[in-house]
Amino acid sequence: MSATAFPTLSTPAGEIPATAPAWNRQRRSQMPSHRYRDVHSRVAVPLTDRQWPTRRLTEAPLWVPVDLRDGNQALAEPMDPARKRRFFELLVAMGYKEIEVGYPSASQTDFDFVRLLADTDLAPDDVTVVVFTPARRDLIERTVESIRGITNPVVVHMYTATAPTWREVVLGHDRAALRALILDGGREVLRCAGDLPTVRFEFSPEVFNLTEPDFVLEICDAMTELWQATPQRPVILNLPATVEVATPNVYADQIEYMHRNLARRDSVILSVHPHNDRGTGIACAELAVLAGAQRVEGCVFGNGERTGNVDIATLALNLHAQGVDPMIDFSDIDEIRRTVEYCNRVEIHARHPYVGDLVHTAFSGTHQDAIKKGLAEHRARAAARGVPEREIDWRVPYLPIDPADIGRSYDAVIRVNSQSGKGGIAYLLESEYGTVLPRRLQIDFARHVQQHTDDTGREVTAAELWSLFSAVYLREGEADAPQADLGNRLGIDGVVASGASAAELGAALRRHGVELEVLAVHHTTVTGELLALVEYRDGAGVRWSAGRGRTAGEAVGNAVAAAVGPATAPARAVAEVRPG
């Protein structure tokens, strides 16, 4: 490709680093990377004997969807009351037991929604309601006003940014002044809501992942002391990766440091809130749970500011795929998707994990062949054990989970385009029409499909595959195509031969001067009708034909008739029928 094809790009033309191996010919680019500092020069992580790498995920953390607050703030068009209510009802139906419902001091819509929960039975008794507030007296008072009368458990979630850049540039405070501001906010929360028996408290040191570990530990310990955290009334300490800045192992180290050094650890629910700026929010959350986190905040399908909050649906289904109960129901993921798209007015990408339109779809020929064989083995194993297919271990290649677990069918698992092979083609014909092609016919038909997709550049549907198959092998509707009746009388250019089997038909053909060697006959069906597949040799080489019928004899007769039609170069032949 010429350098002028993309004139807005500057192809790297610097030197090849002296340390680069001979096989790596990348050159230094013109990207201004020198403007940025790596995370290790911005914040220290005093953890050297980390334990999280040897741990395993064996149970789900407490999932806390923040779609109605954090996710809602990120929408170009925030949810109206009807959409907020619909989303809340979805979260309850899925099984979430702690839901952040809004920022009542920031908007009247959020305040009114919290009051709706107070005035109705929309929130089941076992669902905890979380409300969000900055550490400001007037906003804390407004927040607590919104929750009065709610009989459900309530969490008042207070936050303040603590990282150096935020302290100095945004808030204009040093460490001591910010500590005082946070504790003043904590006292206001205690003054306004401390006597409410169903209320617990949560604190988030915003931008935790860029805050000095000793400072954030000092503040968190001061908050749990102020709020008198006990095992009976634990405090949630939520540690956000507000802007993702490092590889997930760094965040895991930071979480483990807090987990191992917090005071009153048995009275703390350690929570995380990863974002996805580097595209590794999922990994950050999973490693954080290994490191000691017990609670994860995020959004269903990952909506949120910039590149989004961590996707708690993907996190849950990752556990499901490892044999761990996610404690949330995804049995109709397409209904969940429709609701989330309606409420957020944001479409979900076709490749989004688990929920995207194409995540269970294979176009690649090698993938299709493996999936087809895996599904066949799965069915056979279930039949051999005499148990339903849904009850045996899932081990189909390229499909991490059974699509049926989340309400998907197998209809879209295999789709055919120019990258596809015989396995996918055969699978579609079998799944849509009940037609099982023998391997040699799969190979032959794949050549015709490849030519068709190369010519059109389009995906081929199952209906189009069958139309192409009919044109190539059945030859139905052609003016010169011979026909066979129920008695297997074969008309070839006015010459009538009779036969009750493929071998006899072949012999009859030879008696009338048609040299056709029948190599094999296979029997299958097409939408309930009998279908015969005949492999034969004529002057043009080895070929295939097909015929439909109400009886096996009629189907075979029609298949031989279709074979005779294109036979133009007679060759010496010996009639032979081999079992298919």
Swiss-Prot record:
Residues 1-37 are annotated as: Disordered. GO terms for molecular function: 2-isopropylmalate synthase activity; acetyl-CoA C-acetyltransferase activity; magnesium ion binding. Its cofactor is Mg(2+). Pathway: Amino-acid biosynthesis; L-leucine biosynthesis; L-leucine from 3-methyl-2-oxobutanoate: step 1/4. Residues 61-334 form the Pyruvate carboxyltransferase domain. The keyword Cytoplasm applies. Mg(2+) binds at D70, H273, H275, N309. It holds the Pfam family HMGL-like. It is found in: Cytoplasm. Belongs to the alpha-IPM synthase/homocitrate synthase family. LeuA type 2 subfamily. Homodimer. Catalyzes the condensation of the acetyl group of acetyl-CoA with 3-methyl-2-oxobutanoate (2-ketoisovalerate) to form 3-carboxy-3-hydroxy-4-methylpentanoate (2-isopropylmalate). This is 2-isopropylmalate synthase. It comes from Nocardia farcinica (strain IFM 10152).
